[in-house]
């Protein structure tokens, strides 16, 4: 049978062990949704959980739900559920704000404690959101800092000097797939007084 034929696809669908999973999602009829990297489709279970949170925990429980519904421990509870997916111990993972919000917080704090150092070093081909966040931190700090972009032809460690407060670097470049030797970069940055 031709693997590009409708018949082949239908035969494969009929024997797909995951075919029944489609019913777990709230998708409009006829929609094939393959763009789940940033916003997956809503599940029936998630919808019910949100409704319970809205109507019972928030609507009825009000502020008591921080304790009664254990909201206070959700960062640890959710982290423990994520831990096995990444091969970590449940006690070593915590759920927090988005990566972007956390990057803004940590970059702001790092720049603030690095008094006398005014440069953030990053790759020009770094994930765009990370660079936008660095630009936002600089604006927030009154334009007293500057962003130094490392070009592909340069080595990051060659850009480190006594004015570098922070090195902002993604372990794996999302465009090229290049993996940085973070231990070496961190060691070089720390030797020059910069944070990573």
Each model region followed by its residue ranges:
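Pyridoxal 5′-phosphate
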Residues: 1-196
């Amino acid at each position: 049978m031709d693997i590009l034929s409708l018949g082949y696809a239908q035969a494969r669908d009929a024997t797909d062990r995951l075919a029944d999973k489609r019913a777990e999602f709230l998708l409009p009829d006829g929609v094939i949704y393959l763009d789940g990297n940033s916003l997956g489709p809503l599940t029936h279970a998630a919808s019910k959980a949100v409704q319970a949170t809205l109507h019972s925990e928030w609507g009825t429980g009000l502020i008591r739900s921080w304790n009664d519904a254990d909201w206070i421990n959700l960062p640890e509870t959710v982290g423990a559920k994520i831990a096995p997916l990444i091969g970590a111990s449940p006690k070593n993972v915590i759920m927090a704000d988005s990566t972007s919000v956390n990057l803004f917080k940590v970059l702001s704090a790092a720049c603030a404690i690095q008094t006398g150092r005014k440069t953030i070093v990053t790759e020009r081909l770094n994930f765009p959101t990370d660079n936008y966040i660095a630009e936002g931190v600089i604006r927030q700090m009154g334009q007293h800092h500057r962003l130094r972009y490392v070009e592909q032809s340069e080595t990051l460690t060659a850009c480190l000097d006594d004015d570098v407060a922070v090195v902002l670097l993604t372990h794996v470049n999302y465009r090229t797939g290049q993996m940085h030797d973070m231990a070496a970069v961190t060691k070089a940055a720390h030797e020059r007084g910069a944070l990573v």
